[in-house]
Amino acid sequence: FWDKYGTFFILAIIVAIFGTLSSEYFLTTNNITQIFVQSSVTVLIGMGEFFAILVAGIDLSVGAILALSGMVTAKLMLAGVDPFLAALIGGVLVGGALGAINGCLVNWTGLHPFIITLGTNAIFRGITLVISDANSVYGFSFDFVNFFAATPLGIPVPVIFSLIVALILWFLTTRMRVGRNIYAPVSYTHLTLPTILLV
């Protein structure tokens, strides 16, 4: 256990020590809650990037995809799409479509994902700026704000959502054949190298 997670615990202790020394409010409940809430989006992006790296690829456009899908969601809500969950689903579909575009381009062109996603990163960010007119978006419904500000069982909704997604992905990659098969091509790549060299 320590060999696997020791580095994480050491870093957490170092952050806690320096955070406490810099501010007396660092380890307060409110501050820790805000850290988890603000990190929930990063965690979701990281889980998506995890799969890209798992298959020996990389996606540099995850931030741009988040921005564009988020902007589409915001525009749908401001356009009167109700309930707001429908707008959220629309944003998720846009994000999935953008990811599919990346995958198709990598597959069709044969170029490295680094190059493809570097280009689509700029394209997606440009589209986001056009849609938003380079301005912030505000004026969301109270239902939307109240939903994500809720704290059932004392846990913020964004944190709960991140935990649910993490559990689903953990189950997928460790308990289902389709998930374990993702590991196989990468895990055994080194075993094919001697054969290639001999041929």
Show the residue positions of the predicted features.
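N-terminal membrane topogenic signal
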Residues: 1-8
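Alpha-helical transmembrane segments in multi-pass membrane proteins
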Residues: 10, 14, 44-45, 69, ...
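Hydrophobic core of alpha-helical transmembrane segments in multi-pass integral membrane proteins
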Residues: 11-18, 163-168
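Single transmembrane alpha-helix segments in multi-pass membrane proteins
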Residues: 13-21, 25-80, 104-111
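Membrane-embedded alpha-helical core segments of multi-pass
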Residues: 44-48, 68-69, 97-101, 124, ...
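Alpha-helical transmembrane segments within multi-pass membrane transporters and channels
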Residues: 81-121
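Transmembrane helix-bundle core of multi-pass membrane transporters
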Residues: 109, 113-176
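Conserved small/polar residues in nucleotide/adenosyl-binding loops
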Residues: 189-195
